[in-house]
C-alpha cells in the first residue's frame, strides 16, 4: 500500500495593526495565500494579466494547488475535476484581532507534489501575512510550524 501524505500546518501570527476579518476568514486567507504563491511560483502570470499559463501544469505549484488539471477517466469518455489539495481551517479566528494580539489558523496539505513544495508553501503564507489580510490589508508577522498527523 502506498503512503498518501497529509500534513497540517499551524500558522500563528501577531497583528501589527488592528485586523478586521469576515465571520469566516477562510476565503480571505485563501485569496491572500493564492496571490502570494502566484507572485513567487508563477513565471507567466505577470505577462498574462495575472493569469497563470505555466506548462506543463504538473510542474506548477500554483496551478497544482489552485487549478488542478482535470483527469481523464479511462473507462468513460469524461474528465473528472480534482479537488484542490489543501484545506484552510480558519474557524478559530476571531473577526477582530487587535494590534499586538496573536491568532492561529491551520492549513492541511494533501498529496506528494504539495509535500515536495512545503518550504514554498510556508514562505507563501509568510508573504501573505506580511502583505496583509482583512478589509484594511492589516499586516501580521507570521510564525508557522509543521504538525504532521497520521491518517485515520
Feature locations, PLM:
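RNA-interacting cores
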Residues: 1-152
